[in-house]
Amino acid sequence: MADVFAKNIAVSAEDAAKLTPRAEFRVFGRDIIESVKEHMWECKAVLYKARIMPEEVYVLSKNTNEANVKVRDGLLDIKTRVGVTPEGYEIFQPRGKFQFPVKKEELATILENLKVEINLDKSEYTFDEFCDMVRENSKLALVSVEKKRYGFSVNDVICEYAYVWMNGALVESLNEHSDL
């Protein structure tokens, strides 16, 4: 049986640029996972992975919700929303994964997608310098995120339910990813 998650792996900006945009439908709430677990087997779901993810740091912008920027495994990762399907699925395109220290030009692109202007006076920035920059900007916020994810598929469509802690507060998530 093919691993439907394998085709979505990217470890560099070049790899991310080659990925096909995918449509995502995601909900957050409380007490949604039990219902999913009760009904997923009726759909002949195939469980692939249960994973405890390393801590991630998300960057939120008051100026836009079109950019998804996070730091995971030492990489500054960005994808942008490029559309919405008629059914309401958001379409995201990976834009790159950048190793720290991040070059000024790469960081400028990320800040542009977050719709903020910050004077970049150095040629590169460490993770700590990046976080300090975000904290100092009133339009940006850092959110610490921890996830326990359960990946499965239904008819080769990637799905996942997860327990997500955002700055320590627990919320449940359910999502579906579909390549375009």
Whereabouts are the PLM-identified features?
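A short, sequence-level motif marking secondary-structure junctions
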Residues: 98, 164-169
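A short pocket-lining beta-strand/turn micro-motif at the edge of beta-sheets
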Residues: 148, 157, 170-172
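Short, solvent-exposed beta-strand edge segments and adjacent coil->beta transition regions
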Residues: 20-22, 169-173
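N-terminal strand-loop-strand beta-hairpin
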Residues: 2-153
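Mixed-charge, glycine-accented linear interaction segment located at domain edges/termini
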Residues: 166-168, 175-180
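Extended serine/threonine-enriched, polar tracts that run as long, contiguous segments within proteins
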Residues: 153-166
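Generic structural signal for short, solvent-exposed loop/turn connectors between secondary structure elements
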Residues: 46, 155-157, 178-180
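Beta-strand residues in well-ordered beta-sheet regions across diverse protein folds
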Residues: 79-81, 162, 177
